[in-house]
């Protein structure tokens, strides 16, 4: 066993500086600095407290309440209730935190007066202004002005006896805004009005409509040119709320449209916040006006008439929005102000589906017309607008218009090399077909084959995985939502057969066409095809199924996809059709081994099959395999025999699949004899037959199936009885024997009553004839136990009196074994059967328990001393059943009093199952005492267990834990303190079990009890933990750690450490670790929240955005708050805006694909496919070619015919050597990126070594002294793309000159190669000489492990000296003086 070693005395290294942070002067953790800063304003530092005191008013209140009770009579619930009634208001005027709205006004919630700086100046209790009170910042001038106005209004309302309702604040704020002259007063009033106007009742807004709307319009005119964006946003928000509250008749006035036009004008504002606020307001008015929403049922107390208004399909102002948007699509706007067009499209995304049908048609026509423009951004936004129109599934877009619109969108198909636009195009069409299917299914099915054909024959053949996956998802949704609905019934399938057949044919073509990466998607798509239309289109789906199965191979990469699709086909088409298309046997009836992979799939996917097909085809084939199996076994051909054995077993294994809801259960009369013979004669076929019988007898089968299988009970049950009474040989047969008993129990319940009675009588005779406690006796006892459950109450009573009661009473009878071990076995089985009878939900068993409860109670109580330990769990179940079946059982009944000690004694023995039963029994008894008001008496009874042995004490503590968990709030404080003291005594004992139980009790005590009560006993708990022995503390270390964590949640680690003795290093160290872990977790949580806030603010790109409902939009409108209150949100929005702008700059590139033989006509509709974005496959090629330029043959270097590198003299001198081919490639790349200007020529050492990125890097990086670790430094050992190659050395790096191109000179025959470093030699002096533009003349000596060897050190030092001597370093100033000079 390991030991605790204290780490307090170790000299740790301490916290070190992070790399590169040694000059940081502001650390992240500033605990001591914050402590010093908090004492800055104290007048006399010598009198200031060293630490902040924990004495607060709340702590004083809690302390007084925890001490102000009578421990003998007050319960824990009383203390908790008194704590919940605390109010920390110190106001003398009697103002409370809750108020009610006066009659006639809308009910408004109230808030607690939070103790903040703003609470000292404003006692507003209206929930609308909660954020101002709680998030007040004294540094904000706007907050100060708002708080002053709110305080004044609150005071006026209270002086006049108001209830601080939203109506009162609304009226007063409007008066304040109209009377204010200074801008800051108006801004503060408007901000407060925006916070509370959403809760103002609609009748008030209707009554004050003219005056309020006129004031808002004048404010818009006044602040139109102002730099304060927030006031404009708040005014727009207030005006939208007012307009939404007006009824349908109010929109017949011109003044209402005048106010609406004022908001509409700001929807294309240049400022994004103002523009988004206006667009949001327009959308709310169009969709969220009072007459557009469902009518709210009026209450009985209200006087309003509950007259349901006719549902309005479109808003009266929608036509005005449509005219406004169409005015922005004029040619001059498209040519000069495309940004305005984009803003208009953004407005249409949220409002178009609320227009009337004529306006939707006009807008869509203009959208299609501007989509021919070359601006890809405009076209993408048009796709998004159409997508939102289809996504909302508005009834204003009728079926005919939707079908025409889908046909027109087909003409605007982009080129498939442009991945993003193609996916957007397909997604828009998919959503349009889904909407058309909801409106008129036959029109959708007429238009759907065209889209499927385009997706399969063209888009699926793309080499871009992203496009293939997107198209596959669209096809899947169309199959699930459109085709499946068209094939729901036989009539619908007949009407749409031609369209569905075309879709299947288009998909089947892709199975026959050569393809590679798409094969996985095509195979999986067919699984959805089988699910959608497999039941009624079997003939059309048979050829695709045959094609898919031909591709199956165990080594295939798509094996799993093929198996999944075949299983879907089996479920939809049925095993008969699948096996007809793909037969398991050839024409001669011989099993084809290559088709054996279908057998496991058939068992898993078969459902609703025919038993006749199984009998005529599968069983016949299995019999044939069985004959060949035996023939090969007799011929001693083991391999073939084993193959046919497996095939035969797999064919019989199909039986459970054919039993899942069979179509012809009446055919069981022909199949039952075959099954009975197989069960009796072939043990290897029994498992699948058992599974099939369980399927036929299950609850999910029909009544006809149960009746059919019940008629053959005499055929199966006797055979099953014989199998169960046979002694198993091995674990496999033992497991199968248990399975047989499960089949018997389920089959007995489905058999007819006369068959049950007959089998019960025969089983009793067999039981009586068997020897006691023998294998046969136990087997027949289990069979009788399975049958007796379904007998009548009279039959159960007779069996109980004859075979069960003598064993329970341990009578001296011939039916009771005399041997102790055999008696234990008998008692265990008898108690289990009695528990099953008493807990069963069958009517006969419940009747038996009620009628014989007194007899059962007497037998159970008398047999307490004679029962063995292994049957205690069943005894406890029986006692609990007896207690539950008594409706008016008294708490002091004899059954209850005798069940308490038995439950405590067996609380935690032998198994967890018994512990759960004992806990349930104790909780039931606890509930009885609680109902009688004697819960403390029950605790006194349990206290007697503390005087027992170790196990009894442990169980008593755990029983108290169960009582505390269920009825702890009803215990008196004195009783609770007594129990806690007793548990603390056993906590410090040497017994491990007692200590573990005591800690479990303390954990429950901390969870259940109120904090003040736990605080009163906190010192005793901590001192008891410290006083534990080392052995028990080590044994319960995990439980102690959990206890300390729970304590640290309710109290601080510092408070707990104050109660721990100083010599207990273990507890102190654990508390310290918990404190560190808590702080670390808090920092992580804060960082995660900050990251989530920043990520939530980012804009979701693409068409698959969240579809907001009008309720979500209305909820968003409630967050109209001052800007400086949402600083964090604005920071996140700014970050997201910067990210979006950065992405927008990257996405502005647009390219036109040209044909050198044709002229591009941008006005032609077909030219829309030639406009590509930067994300297309063709435009990505130049960028990829630049990145992969180093991957050219030979790395881009020129080579001779013999493989040598050709390096010109110009390259060695670093001069320009550009050839025409390189210029052409660079110019092509620049043209691909849309650049026309010529780049200035830069001298390069090699033709293809540098790139445009290197030139840009040379221009941007200033000249500086390189450090040793710089990537451009030669010392660093790093290489970059801009490094220059210099010839020199050996091999292919040798100098390429005329004289020494070969190793030997042809003329002289001597070697012309010079020793390395000779070019640094001086002609007139000794030593080496540094040359400009070359490396320093260093001698690089390799460092090996031999240099570290002591025996070889002297030899290596001599080598080093020779090197120095050769370099002239040891000759002093004579030889090395010139070399040792410092060169700049």
UniProtKB/Swiss-Prot annotation:
GO molecular function: RNA binding
Compositionally biased intervals (Gly residues): 1369-1378
Similarity comment: Belongs to the RRP12 family.
KW Transit peptide (keyword) present: no
Region (Disordered): 1-32, 1082-1102, 1114-1155, 1176-1384
Keywords assigned: Nucleus, Phosphoprotein
Modified residues (Phosphoserine): 82, 85, 96, 1094-1095, 1117, 1119, 1221, 1225, 1227, 1230, 1250-1251
One cellular component term from this protein's GO annotations in UniProt: nucleus
Phylogenetic placement of the source organism: Eukaryota, Metazoa, Ecdysozoa, Arthropoda, Hexapoda
Mitochondrion recorded as keyword: no
Main subcellular location: nucleus
Origin species: Drosophila melanogaster (Fruit fly)
InterPro entries: ARM-like (IPR011989), ARM-type_fold (IPR016024), RRP12 (IPR052087), RRP12-like_dom (IPR012978)
Composition bias type Polar residues, residue spans: 19-29, 1176-1191, 1276-1285, 1297-1315
Protein name per Swiss-Prot or TrEMBL: RRP12-like protein
Basic residues composition-biased segments: 1-13, 1348-1362
Pfam families associated with the record: RRP12_HEAT
Acidic residues bias (residue ranges): 1090-1099, 1114-1127
Subcellular location: Nucleus
Biased composition regions of type Basic and acidic residues, renumbered to the chain: 1321-1334
């Amino acid at each position: 066993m390991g030991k605790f070693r204290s780490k307090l005395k170790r000299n740790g290294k301490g916290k070190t500086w992070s790399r590169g942070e040694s000059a940081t002067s502001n650390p992240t953790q500033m605990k001591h600095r914050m402590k010093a800063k908090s004492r800055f304003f104290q007048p006399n530092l010598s009198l200031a407290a060293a630490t902040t005191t924990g004495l607060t008013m709340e702590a004083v209140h809690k302390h007084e309440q925890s001490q102000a009770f009578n421990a003998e009579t007050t319960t824990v619930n009383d203390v908790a209730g008194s704590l919940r009634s605390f109010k920390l208001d110190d106001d003398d005027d009697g103002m409370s935190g809750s108020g009610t709205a006066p009659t006639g006004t809308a009910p408004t919630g109230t808030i607690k007066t939070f103790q903040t700086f703003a609470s000292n100046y404003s006692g507003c209790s209206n929930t609308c202004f909660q954020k101002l009170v709680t998030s007040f910042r004294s540094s904000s001038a706007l907050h100060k002005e708002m708080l002053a106005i709110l305080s004044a209004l609150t005071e006026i309302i209270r002086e006049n006896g108001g209830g601080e309702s939203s109506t009162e604040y609304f009226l007063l704020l409007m008066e304040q805004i109209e009377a204010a002259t200074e801008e800051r007063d108006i801004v503060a009033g408007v901000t407060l009005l925006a916070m509370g106007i959403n809760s103002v009742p609609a009748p008030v807004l209707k009554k004050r409509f003219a005056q309020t709307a006129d004031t808002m319009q004048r404010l818009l005119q006044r602040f139109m040119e102002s730099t304060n964006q927030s006031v404009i946003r708040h005014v727009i928000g207030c005006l939208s709320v007012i307009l939404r509250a007006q009824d349908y008749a109010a929109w017949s006035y011109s003044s209402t449209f005048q106010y609406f036009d004022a908001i509409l004008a700001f929807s294309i504002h240049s400022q994004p916040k103002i523009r988004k606020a206006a667009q949001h307001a327009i959308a709310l008015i169009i969709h969220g006006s009072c007459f557009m929403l469902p009518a709210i049922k009026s209450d009985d107390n209200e006087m309003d008439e509950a007259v349901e208004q006719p549902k309005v399909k479109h808003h009266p102002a929608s036509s005005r929005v449509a005219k406004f948007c169409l005015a922005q699509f004029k040619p001059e706007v498209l040519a000069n102000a495309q940004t305005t067009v984009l803003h208009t499209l953004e407005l249409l995304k949220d409002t178009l589906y609320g227009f009337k049908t004529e306006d939707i048609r006009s807008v869509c026509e203009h959208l299609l017309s501007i989509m021919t423009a070359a601006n890809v951004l405009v076209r993408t936004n048009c796709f998004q607008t159409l997508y939102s129109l289809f996504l909302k599934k508005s009834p204003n877009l009728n079926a005919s218009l939707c079908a025409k619109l889908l046909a027109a969108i087909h003409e605007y198909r982009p080129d498939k090399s442009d991945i993003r636009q193609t996916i957007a195009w397909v997604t828009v069409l998919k959503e349009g077909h889904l909407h058309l299917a909801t409106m008129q299914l036959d029109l959708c099915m007429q238009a759907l084959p065209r889209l499927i054909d385009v997706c399969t024959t063209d888009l699926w053949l793309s080499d871009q995985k992203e496009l293939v996956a997107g198209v596959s998802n669209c096809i899947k949704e169309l199959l699930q939502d459109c085709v499946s609905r068209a094939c729901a019934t036989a009539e619908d399938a007949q009407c749409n057969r031609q369209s569905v057949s075309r879709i299947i044919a288009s998909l089947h073509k892709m199975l026959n066409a050569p393809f590679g990466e798409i094969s996985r998607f095509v195979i999986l798509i067919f699984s959805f095809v089988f699910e959608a239309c497999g039941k009624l289109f079997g003939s059309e789906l048979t050829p695709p199924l045959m094609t898919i199965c031909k591709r199956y191979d165990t080594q295939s990469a798509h094996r799993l996809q093929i198996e999944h699709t075949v299983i879907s086909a089996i479920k939809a088409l049925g095993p008969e059709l699948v096996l007809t298309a793909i037969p398991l046997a050839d024409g001669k009836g011989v099993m084809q081994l290559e088709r054996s992979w279908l057998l496991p799939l058939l068992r898993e996917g078969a459902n609703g099959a025919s038993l006749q097909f199984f009998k005529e085809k599968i069983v016949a084939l299995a019999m044939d395999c069985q004959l060949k199996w035996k023939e090969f076994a007799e011929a001693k051909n083991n391999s073939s025999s084993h193959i046919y054995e497996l095939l035969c077993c797999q064919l019989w294994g199909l039986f459970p699949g054919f039993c899942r809801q069979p179509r012809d259960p009446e055919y069981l009369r022909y199949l039952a004899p075959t099954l009975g013979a197989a069960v009796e004669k072939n043990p290897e076929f029994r498992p699948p037959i058992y599974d099939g019988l369980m399927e036929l007898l299950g609850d999910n089968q029909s009544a006809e199936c149960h009746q059919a299988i019940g008629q053959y009970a005499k055929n199966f049950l006797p055979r099953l009885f014989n199998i169960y009474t046979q002694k198993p040989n091995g674990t496999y047969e033992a497991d199968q024997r248990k399975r047989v008993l499960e089949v018997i129990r389920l089959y007995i319940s489905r058999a007819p009553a006369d068959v049950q009675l007959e089998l019960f009588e025969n089983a009793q005779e067999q039981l009586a004839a068997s020897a006691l406690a023998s294998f046969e006796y136990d087997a027949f006892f289990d069979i009788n136990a399975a049958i007796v459950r379904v007998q009548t109450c009279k039959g159960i009573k007779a069996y109980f009196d004859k075979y069960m009661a003598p064993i329970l009473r341990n009578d001296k009878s011939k039916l009771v074994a005399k041997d102790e071990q055999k008696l234990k076995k008998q008692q265990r089985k008898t108690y289990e059967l009695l528990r099953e009878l008493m807990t069963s939900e069958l009517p006969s068993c419940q009747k038996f328990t009620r009628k014989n409860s007194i007899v059962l109670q007497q037998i159970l109580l008398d047999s307490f001393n004679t029962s063995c330990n292994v049957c205690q769990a069943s005894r406890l179940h029986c006692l609990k059943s007896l207690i539950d079946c008594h409706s008016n059982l008294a708490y002091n009944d004899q059954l209850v009093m005798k069940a308490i000690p038995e439950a405590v004694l067996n609380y935690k023995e032998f198994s967890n199952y018994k512990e759960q039963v004992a806990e349930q029994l104790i909780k039931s008894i606890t509930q009885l005492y609680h109902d009688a008001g004697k819960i403390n008496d029950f605790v006194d009874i349990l206290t007697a267990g503390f005087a027992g042995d170790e196990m009894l004490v442990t169980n008593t503590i755990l029983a108290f834990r169960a009582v505390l968990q269920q009825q702890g709030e009803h215990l008196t404080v004195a009783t609770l303190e007594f129990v806690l003291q007793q548990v603390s005594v056993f906590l410090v004992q040497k017994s491990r079990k007692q200590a573990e139980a005591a800690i479990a009790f303390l954990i429950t005590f901390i969870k259940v009890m109120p904090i003040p009560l736990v605080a009163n006993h906190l010192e005793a708990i901590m001192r008891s933990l410290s006083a534990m022995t080392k052995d028990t503390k080590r044994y319960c270390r995990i439980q102690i750690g959990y206890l300390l964590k729970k304590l640290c949640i309710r109290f601080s680690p510092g408070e707990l450490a104050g109660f721990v003795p100083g010599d207990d290093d273990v507890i102190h160290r654990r508390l310290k670790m918990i404190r560190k872990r808590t702080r670390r977790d808090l920092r992580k949580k804060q960082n995660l929240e900050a990251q989530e806030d920043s990520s939530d603010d980012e804009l979701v790109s693409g068409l698959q955005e969240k579809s907001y409902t009008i309720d979500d939009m209305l909820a968003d409108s409630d967050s109209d708050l001052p800007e400086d209150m949402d600083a964090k949100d604005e920071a996140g929005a700014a970050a997201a805006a910067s990210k979006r702008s950065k992405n927008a700059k990257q996405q502005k590139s647009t390219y036109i694909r040209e044909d050198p033989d044709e002229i591009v006509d941008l006005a032609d509709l077909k030219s829309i496919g030639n406009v590509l974005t930067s994300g297309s496959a063709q435009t990505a090629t130049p960028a990829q070619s630049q990145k992969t330029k180093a991957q050219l043959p030979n790395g881009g270097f020129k080579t001779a015919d013999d493989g040598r590198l050709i390096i010109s003299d110009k390259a060695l001198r670093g001069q320009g050597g550009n050839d025409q081919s390189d210029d052409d490639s660079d110019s092509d790349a620049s043209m691909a990126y849309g650049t026309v200007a010529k780049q200035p020529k830069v001298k390069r050492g090699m033709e293809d070594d540098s790139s445009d990125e290197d030139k840009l890097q040379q221009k941007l990086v200033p000249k500086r002294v390189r450090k040793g670790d710089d990537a451009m430094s030669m010392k660093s050992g790093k290489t970059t793309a801009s490094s220059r190659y210099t010839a020199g050395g050996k091999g292919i790096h040798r100098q390429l000159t005329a004289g020494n191109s070969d190793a030997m000179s042809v003329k002289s025959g001597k070697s012309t190669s010079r020793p390395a470093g000779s070019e640094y030699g001086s002609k007139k002096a000794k030593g080496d000489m540094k040359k400009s533009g070359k490396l320093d003349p260093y001698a690089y000596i390799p460092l090996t492990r031999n240099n570290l060897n002591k025996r070889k050190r002297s030899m290596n030092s001599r080598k080093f000296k020779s090197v120095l001597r050769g370099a002239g370093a040891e000759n002093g100033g004579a030889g090395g003086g010139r070399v040792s000079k410092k060169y700049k």
